[in-house]
């Protein structure tokens, strides 16, 4: 009986530690997404590139080409007078594993102002923690599909349903 009590206490401790870790992971990926989005709208190209997954960087032609693409996007955002008015996380991140990686699907709800108009955007960022890595990197969610996620990240859980996304004028 004593060993059963000890086992239950140990299991409760492990479950509690996992819940704390999960909460810390959720806070971390949300803060990383906040940093990434702020960096984009503030023109911080280095931070945007640092938070972009290496597979995406490679598909863009390498770091120099990726930097140029981000710089061009920043110019378009500034020319359109686009600003993030608000950024919230409507649901907690979902964590998945596959192909030796950890993934975080981080839902976002933002209000963007542009040339006197406001746009509401429900979207998500796909976070990736590669084996041996300590920092999460991301892929913008509206560009991720069940088909291309397997090309980008073989082993991603094939049955996962990505959250919906939309953009609408307010």
Language-model segments: residues:
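Sec-dependent signal peptide recognition
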Residues: 1-7
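Intrinsic-disorder-associated interaction segments
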Residues: 22, 26, 59, 63-66, ...
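Short, low-complexity N-terminal intrinsically disordered segments enriched in polar/charged residues
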Residues: 4, 15-42
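Exposed beta-sheet edge and beta->alpha loop/turn motif
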Residues: 92-170
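Hydrophobic alpha-helical core bundles mediating ligand binding, dimerization, or RNAP-core interactions
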Residues: 33, 40, 52, 142-143
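Short solvent-exposed beta->alpha transition segments
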Residues: 30-31, 46-103
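Generic surface-pattern signal
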Residues: 38-42, 71, 75-79, 154, ...
